[in-house]
């Protein structure tokens, strides 16, 4: 039996022990045994200690160090619940952070009480730019600060009573963790995507196929005649991880390259708000595009919010169309093919100009020596020559993000001074560059059809280009016509429908060798390198020729070295011509190594980039299943047990994965997409049994609160704002200033954070849990109001009073067996059924409402002593929401074991059936009265009751209805 925090061992009266005599002022006159913040603090502290000592939430694995020591089998009925793990910032938690954590804890506790083996753990996503920036500002090493932050987060989370298996917690910065991040990187690096098999395969199998002659080189060369270096180049070009000279988002102010998702819509860094420039650099890339179809198609088997699925579908962006080859002439006189991709090949006859992305590889080759005679000044951008105009335009758009370029309403561009031949008409069309065409989508070149594409129409109008109608039905003098119609001005396509024309022109392009049917995606390969310090080092070294070599798995982990200067080389934020200089380049002893990679001891240099902050979160769910495994990232048996497909439970298409994943929708096209990609590669290579990482996803809403800004729009600390005379003032350093109230997401940026420590101190953790769960559906954002927290506290006080006499501490429960009245039994079993259904569906707010209703019923119905048979089920039902209070009451009721493993009460179906039914009575469609009849009353009895109702009779005023309609169990309608 565990010792109660509020009872002296051996005492039967429940007299408090260790509770200070001076309680807070608000409750100084309260009865000695009332459920107060101080009593709650003692209860919570002791039960948290008990849970930790007893390992209450520790769950067994089938194999390994967490398997049952006696060799017993693990339960078949299991559940894996996971939260998006937090970044341990220096500010600690605010009350918005625990919303999802509490919700999943309620869900996990409920299912644990139902007898399921529940895995619920929480780690920390601790690598990344924020810790590095803080370290640079303060001179504190990122690891020192991060570890201190993790300790504080664990303390704050521990106060909430979350039922996590603490043995499974880790940080992505733990060497034992990122060793396996590096290992997974090597698995992806040493793999290639077999398009015919639609899966990844080991790179060794590709080499074997080339060696045997089973596979030929696409360029026609003979594999057997290639040098070792040439063979390595071929293999490197097939890898799922590769280096490429690609356009990247270079941020001089941060000294690093950013992924597209880390750049805001106005072309600035998400962190720091620095300008970001498009720049060509050699970078590590991950070939996520190889999985475009599978990432898209497998969304159909996931139980995810439609919003997130739509965001991923749009981000992947599958488009069906055709490629077409326009021929042009280089500046040296050579003919070159300009390939475009279009979803509207039917409009090819209407293509009156071409547009290339300013970064397109062929732009410099196609720039004319001078402007053709009679060139329109609108085309030249004010440049004396095409080369000058192109250079100036590139400089002007370098600061724009991809999103800003696509959404810009003002269409700009410059003429290259050269033309290409339209394969449909045989006529020359001018070639432009413009920022609304992106190098990363399609071929980086488009055929412009201003008559039937609004962006092209806007561009043509701005630069005075011709507009040709090829689909009848609109007025192209006013706007582009994008509807259906019959083809016109299109040669052999005239008279065809749009669908017929698409097929016909695609077939003609294929037969003439000028194009083919094609599918394109918006998704780009993943830029997988950062010029920072605080991240996972790459398990890659370079030889004297600069060729990369993967380290053997036995060389892992490649540990991040401690260096005296870990700050990146920062540049003038506006210096677009600066070049990255990673901090790890300063660690010379670590950088230069001698290794034997199979051909003798040779000098190598390590890669000085680090992995992006998304690396650890792309696989961390797997490590929860086997956190101490030193030989594998996780044992296959453990992954299969926790994450394997369960078709009997979820249907034949069940992809497997975590049973419930809860986190913010802001990660839809970042973490969630990257995690799916890594998981699919591991699945293809046979390392996991599940083909998706997360079977079910729920996005929790935000907790919002008032924030305040001064006249400049800068936020001021909300807790220091004073409301006065209908307005708000802030006591600044130079006196009071007027501030303006707004409503937004709670957090440090708006300076309106409220610490959960503050609420726990004032009310107790169980009160915070109940309040946050009662605020609304988990998916909805909700306003925080500290003044409303007291309502949750008073509810728990009422539950406490049903069991404990506030004056004496004695148990009030009636143990004498007595026959319960029907109303009490009906209230009990309806509460059980409703609360259980709500917990299972994560409707915690309505579960709270039902528990309050049942508590109020017991308070009114049983004023002296509540029968044990109806109070114990209440304690069990409250346990997922307020576990500390429930454990304490459960023990005081005489139980010697924790209720964490149940059993959760079961409802008796006999008491869920109504004896009576209330019918609204309508007269000509409007409700005029209500009648209550027996649940088994037939239509005649219902009609009679409706006609006999005094309110209905008064409204009828003696008139007889022409028709009486009874909708069984729902309503009666009298037609007069």
Curated annotation (Swiss-Prot):
<keyword id="KW-0963">Cytoplasm</keyword>
<dbReference type="GO" id="GO:0005829">
    <property type="term" value="C:cytosol"/>
</dbReference>
<dbReference type="InterPro" id="IPR009008">
    <property type="entry name" value="Val/Leu/Ile-tRNA-synth_edit"/>
</dbReference>
<comment type="similarity">
    <text>Belongs to the class-I aminoacyl-tRNA synthetase family.</text>
</comment>
<feature type="short sequence motif" description="'HIGH' region">
    <location>
        <begin position="86"/>
        <end position="97"/>
    </location>
</feature>
<dbReference type="GO" id="GO:0006429">
    <property type="term" value="P:leucyl-tRNA aminoacylation"/>
</dbReference>
<protein>
    <recommendedName>
        <fullName>Leucine--tRNA ligase</fullName>
        <ecNumber>6.1.1.4</ecNumber>
    </recommendedName>
</protein>
<dbReference type="GO" id="GO:0004823">
    <property type="term" value="F:leucine-tRNA ligase activity"/>
</dbReference>
<dbReference type="InterPro" id="IPR015413">
    <property type="entry name" value="Methionyl/Leucyl_tRNA_Synth"/>
</dbReference>
<feature type="compositionally biased region" description="Low complexity">
    <location>
        <begin position="1"/>
        <end position="23"/>
    </location>
</feature>
<keyword id="KW-0030">Aminoacyl-tRNA synthetase</keyword>
<dbReference type="GO" id="GO:0002161">
    <property type="term" value="F:aminoacyl-tRNA deacylase activity"/>
</dbReference>
<dbReference type="InterPro" id="IPR002302">
    <property type="entry name" value="Leu-tRNA-ligase"/>
</dbReference>
<keyword id="KW-0648">Protein biosynthesis</keyword>
<dbReference type="InterPro" id="IPR013155">
    <property type="entry name" value="M/V/L/I-tRNA-synth_anticd-bd"/>
</dbReference>
<dbReference type="InterPro" id="IPR001412">
    <property type="entry name" value="aa-tRNA-synth_I_CS"/>
</dbReference>
<dbReference type="Pfam" id="PF13603">
    <property type="entry name" value="tRNA-synt_1_2"/>
</dbReference>
<feature type="short sequence motif" description="'KMSKS' region">
    <location>
        <begin position="745"/>
        <end position="749"/>
    </location>
</feature>
<dbReference type="InterPro" id="IPR014729">
    <property type="entry name" value="Rossmann-like_a/b/a_fold"/>
</dbReference>
<feature type="binding site">
    <location>
        <position position="748"/>
    </location>
    <ligand>
        <name>ATP</name>
    </ligand>
</feature>
<dbReference type="Pfam" id="PF09334">
    <property type="entry name" value="tRNA-synt_1g"/>
</dbReference>
<keyword id="KW-0436">Ligase</keyword>
<feature type="region of interest" description="Disordered">
    <location>
        <begin position="1"/>
        <end position="34"/>
    </location>
</feature>
<dbReference type="InterPro" id="IPR009080">
    <property type="entry name" value="tRNAsynth_Ia_anticodon-bd"/>
</dbReference>
<dbReference type="Pfam" id="PF08264">
    <property type="entry name" value="Anticodon_1"/>
</dbReference>
<keyword id="KW-0547">Nucleotide-binding</keyword>
<dbReference type="GO" id="GO:0005524">
    <property type="term" value="F:ATP binding"/>
</dbReference>
<keyword id="KW-0067">ATP-binding</keyword>
<dbReference type="InterPro" id="IPR025709">
    <property type="entry name" value="Leu_tRNA-synth_edit"/>
</dbReference>
């Amino acid at each position: 039996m565990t010792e109660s925090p509020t009872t002296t061992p051996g005492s039967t009266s429940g007299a408090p022990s260790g509770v200070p005599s001076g309680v807070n002022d608000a409750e100084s006159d309260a009865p000695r045994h009332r459920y107060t913040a101080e009593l709650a603090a003692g209860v919570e502290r002791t039960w948290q200690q008990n849970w930790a000592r007893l390992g209450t939430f520790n769950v067994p694995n089938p194999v390994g160090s967490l398997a049952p020591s006696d060799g017993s089998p693990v339960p078949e009925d299991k559940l894996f619940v996971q939260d998006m793990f937090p970044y341990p910032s220096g500010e600690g938690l605010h009350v918005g952070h625990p919303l999802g954590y509490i919700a999943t804890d309620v869900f996990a506790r409920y299912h644990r009480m139902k007898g399921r083996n529940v895995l619920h753990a929480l780690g920390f996503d601790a690598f990344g730019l924020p810790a590095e920036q803080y370290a640079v500002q303060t001179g504190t090493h990122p690891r020192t600060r991060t570890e201190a932050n993790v300790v504080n987060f664990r303390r704050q989370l521990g106060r909430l009573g979350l039922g996590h298996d603490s043995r499974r917690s880790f940080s992505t910065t733990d060497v034992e963790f990122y060793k396996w991040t590096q290992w997974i990187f090597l698995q992806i690096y040493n793999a290639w995507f077999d398009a015919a098999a639609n899966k990844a395969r080991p790179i060794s199998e590709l080499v074997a196929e080339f060696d045997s002659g089973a596979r030929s080189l696409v360029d026609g060369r003979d594999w057997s005649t290639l040098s070792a270096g040439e063979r390595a180049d071929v293999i490197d070009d097939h890898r799922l991880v590769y280096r490429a000279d690609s356009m990247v988002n270079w941020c001089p102010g941060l000294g690093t390259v950013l992924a597209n998702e880390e750049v805001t819509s106005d072309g600035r860094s998400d962190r720091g708000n620095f300008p970001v420039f498009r720049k060509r650099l050699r970078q590590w890339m991950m070939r996520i595009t190889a999985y475009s179809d599978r990432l898209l198609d497998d969304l159909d088997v996931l139980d995810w919010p439609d919003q997130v699925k739509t965001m991923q579908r749009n981000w992947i962006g599958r488009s069906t169309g055709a490629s077409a080859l326009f021929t042009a002439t280089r500046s040296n006189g050579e003919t070159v093919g300009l390939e475009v991709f279009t979803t509207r090949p039917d409009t090819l006859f209407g293509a009156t100009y071409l547009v290339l992305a300013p970064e397109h590889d062929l732009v410099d080759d196609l720039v004319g020596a001078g402007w053709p005679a009679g060139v329109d000044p609108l085309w030249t951008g004010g440049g004396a020559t095409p080369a000058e105009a192109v250079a100036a335009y590139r400089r002007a758009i370098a600061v724009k993000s991809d999103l800003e370029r696509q959404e810009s309403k003002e269409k700009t561009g410059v003429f290259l001074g050269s033309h290409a031949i339209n394969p449909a008409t045989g006529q020359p069309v001018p070639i432009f560059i413009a920022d609304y065409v992106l190098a990363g989508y399609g071929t980086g070149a488009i055929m412009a059809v201003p008559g039937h594409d609004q962006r092209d129409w806007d561009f043509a109008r701005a630069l005075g280009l011709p507009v040709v109608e090829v689909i009848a039905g609109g007025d192209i003098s006013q706007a582009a016509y994008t509807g259906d119609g019959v083809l016109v001005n299109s040669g052999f396509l005239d008279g065809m429908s749009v669908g017929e024309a698409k097929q016909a022109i695609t077939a003609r392009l294929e037969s003439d060798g000028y194009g083919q049917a094609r599918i394109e995606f918006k998704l780009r390969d993943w830029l997988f390198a950062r010029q920072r310090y605080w991240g996972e080092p790459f398990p890659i070294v370079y030889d004297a020729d600069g060729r990369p070599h993967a380290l053997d798995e036995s060389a892992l982990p490649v540990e991040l070295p401690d260096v005296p200067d870990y700050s990146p080389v920062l540049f003038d934020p506006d210096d677009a011509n600066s070049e990255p200089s990673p901090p790890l380049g300063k660690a010379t002893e670590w950088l230069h190594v001698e290794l034997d990679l199979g051909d003798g001891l040779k000098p190598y240099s390590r890669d000085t980039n680090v992995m992006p902050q998304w690396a650890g979160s792309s696989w961390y769910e797997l490590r929860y299943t086997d956190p101490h495994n030193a030989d594998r990232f996780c044992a296959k048996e453990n992954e299969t047990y926790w994450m394997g497909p369960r078709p009997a439970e979820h249907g034949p298409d069940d992809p497997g994965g975590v049973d419930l994943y809860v986190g913010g929708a802001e990660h839809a096209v970042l973490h969630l997409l990257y995690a799916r990609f890594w998981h699919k590669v591991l699945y293809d290579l046979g390392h996991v049994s599940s083909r998706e990482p997360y079977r079910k996803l729920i996005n929790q809403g935000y907790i919002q609160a008032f924030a305040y800004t001064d006249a400049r729009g800068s936020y001021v600390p909300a807790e220091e704002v004073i409301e006065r005379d209908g307005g708000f003032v802030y006591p600044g350093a130079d006196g009071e200033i007027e501030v303006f109230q707004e409503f937004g997401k709670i957090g440090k940026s708006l300076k309106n954070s409220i610490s959960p420590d503050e609420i726990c101190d004032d009310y107790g953790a169980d009160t915070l849990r109940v309040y946050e769960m009662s605020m609304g559906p988990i998916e909805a954002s909700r306003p925080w109001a500290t003044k409303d927290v007291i309502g949750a506290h008073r509810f728990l006080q009422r539950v406490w009073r049903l069991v404990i006499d506030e004056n004496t501490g004695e148990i009030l429960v009636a143990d004498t067996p007595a026959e319960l009245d029907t109303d009490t039994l009906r209230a009990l079993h309806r509460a059980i059924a409703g609360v259980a259904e709500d917990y299972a569906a994560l409707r915690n707010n309505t579960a709270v409402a039902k528990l309050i209703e049942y508590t109020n019923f017991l308070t009114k119905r049983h004023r002296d002593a509540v029968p044990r048979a109806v109070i114990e089920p209440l304690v069990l039902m409250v346990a997922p929401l307020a576990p500390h209070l429930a454990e304490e009451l459960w023990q005081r009721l005489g139980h010697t074991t924790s209720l964490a493993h149940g059993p959760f009460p079961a409802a008796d179906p006999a008491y869920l059936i109504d004896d009576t039914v209330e019918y609204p009575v309508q007269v000509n469609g409007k409700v005029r009265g209500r009648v209550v009849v027996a649940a088994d009353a037939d239509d005649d009895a219902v009609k009679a009751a409706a006609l006999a109702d005094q309110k209905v009779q008064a409204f009828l005023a003696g008139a007889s209805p022409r028709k009486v309609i009874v909708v069984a169990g729902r309503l009666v309608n009298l037609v007069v």
